């Protein structure tokens, strides 16, 4: 049986990467929230 999670770096970048976050208002909100918290990494890839 094929498993549900088939990792792909390209797919992951396109959905949760920095550019994807910057493309939407809620994504920008998320980045600003992480900046306010002082996160070492803004995106978790």
UniProtKB/Swiss-Prot annotation:
The keyword Ribonucleoprotein applies. Residues 1-45 are annotated as: Disordered. One of its GO terms (cellular component) is ribosome. Residues 1-14, 31-45 have a biased composition (Basic residues). It holds the Pfam family Ribosomal_L34. Gene3D superfamilies: 1.10.287.3980. One of its GO terms (molecular function) is structural constituent of ribosome. Keywords: Ribonucleoprotein, Ribosomal protein. One of its GO terms (biological process) is translation. Coiled coil: none annotated. Belongs to the bacterial ribosomal protein bL34 family. This is Large ribosomal subunit protein bL34.
């Amino acid at each position: 049986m094929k498993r549900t999670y088939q990792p792909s770096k390209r797919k992951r970048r396109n959905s949760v990467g920095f550019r994807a976050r910057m493309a939407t208002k809620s994504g920008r909100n998320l980045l600003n929230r992480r900046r306010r918290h002082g996160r070492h990494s803004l995106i978790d890839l």
